[in-house]
Amino acid sequence: MDTSVLNPELQIHGFIGVDSLQSSRKRKNDFDDFPLNKGLKTNNNDYSGSIEPKFSPALSIKEDGKNDRNFEALMSLQAQDSNLSEQNTSIHLDALASSSIALGNDNVDSSAFLSKVNKGVNAMRNSTSNQTNDSILISPSEITNMDPFLKGSARWTAEHWDYLERRMQNFCQTYSLDHTQVADSLHEKRLHGPLSSLVKLLVQEMPSFTRRTILRHLRALYNIPGYEKYSRKNSSGRGDFGVQETAIISQEVHNFIMDQGWSEYQFCNQIWAGKCPKTIRMFYSNLYKKLSHRDAKSIYHHVRRAYNPFEDRCVWSKEEDEELRKNVVEHGKCWTKIGRKMARMPNDCRDRWRDVVRFGDKLKRNAWSLEEETQLLQIVAELRNREDLSSDINWTLVAQMLGTRTRLQCRYKFQQLTKAASKFELQENVWLLERIYDSLLNNGGKIHWENIVKEANGRWTRDQMLFQFINLKKMIPSYDNLPLLEATKSAIDDFKVVLSGFSN
């Protein structure tokens, strides 16, 4: 096993005490990142159609009073790292029935390309006939003095997959679990017991990655729905770059900077130079031949994303937002020029402008109002009427028309509003319109959705009924010509005429 992905400080037994493990539970973002959950309020009824996660009793151990046992078992995992190095076995899949773990069989030699932690000091193992599995350890001072941009741009490589697979193999042996039980537990929105403690230990062992990144890849390892994009992939020629492709690029970059006598930071500056130097053009030409199944443009952009000299990737201060605003006024949307002036990725500048800065003080982060939701649905319906229904929705344009929410907020809210519900039949449309008519009549022309939701008895959420009402308004001509109350009464009468025809 390539233990260079670990923090060597943590290889000293006894370094992590029970107190430090308990204190790590106080970390923020202890929840995972299930798709669309962030920033959204979800109704328990919305999950009625989903698969009920089955948490194994073996993993539902109460943490109070049993932390010592969990910790001792986890420390034994660290103590057995040397044994794991000698075992090159993958997770056995015999115990799995319907869901199997997608383990890589791409046979990438993890010693053939640059390790993520060793990247900052240009350390590389030589591939020779008598090569061993001994890791190249970096002193704590070297880790501290690494270029700060490395952590933000860390790439998950074959070495990390190998290590994660072996960790899970040993974890299952320690707790006498099969991988089906682990997979069931990973369906839970929050981890418990020894599995939660293992994730916290992995966070300390792989400091280049956040807890969220580790959890995403762990769930992808066990084929949890929604995490397919993080799974271990071979070279496909499309989509995200696979493990083999990433390994080839890393090896080519290492060979190139060794030949040129550069540091990696110098290489990053060269590929981001205003005019691409001849040596860099030769590097790309050679790389295109190595990855001939890939489009040259996708390779070019992948290398620039993976190797860039910019330190900050996520956090923006108010001063930087104001600087970005001034640069857009001065240079327009020339993101390459703006990115060079601000020492940031051009795409980061573009996204920050598009998602935050251009809204100014109008941007809202609080809960959506009913008026905003209605306006969002109407905007999407209008755009779909203009364009082909099969085409993707332009969420940037939707956000621009709404004026108070970002494109991501609009997209997530629309998906929440239109999530799958029981289909409205003709009689149910009449039921819905009658409840809306009564609410309008009794509340001065206002719709009290909370009362209608109670009468629905959990069959539909407020969002689903609102979406259906907006669709009905588009279908029924009377809503274009009459006030809301009168149009609703007319629609009810029309539907009842149709129903009476069916009954006859």
UniProtKB/Swiss-Prot annotation:
Top-level taxon in the UniProt lineage: Eukaryota
GO BP term, example: replication fork arrest at rDNA repeats
Function: DNA-binding protein that recognizes sites within both the enhancer and the promoter of rRNA transcription, as well as upstream of many genes transcribed by RNA polymerase II. Has a role in the termination of RNA polymerase I catalyzed transcription.
One MF annotation (Gene Ontology) recorded for this entry: transcription termination site sequence-specific DNA binding
CC annotations in GO: nucleolar peripheral inclusion body; nucleus; rDNA heterochromatin
Record region (Disordered): 30-51
UniProt protein name: DNA-binding protein reb1
Main location: nucleus
All copies of domain HTH myb-type, residue ranges: 308-361, 362-422
PANTHER family: CYCLIN-D-BINDING MYB-LIKE TRANSCRIPTION FACTOR 1 (PTHR46380), DNA-BINDING PROTEIN REB1 (PTHR46380:SF5)
Keyword Transcription tagged: yes
Compartments it resides in: Nucleus
Annotated keywords: DNA-binding, Nucleus, Repeat, Transcription, Transcription regulation
SUPFAM superfamilies for the chain: Homeodomain-like (SSF46689)
One Pfam family, short name: Reb1_MybAD
Name of the gene encoding the protein in the UniProt record: reb1
Positions of the DNA-binding region: 335-357, 395-418
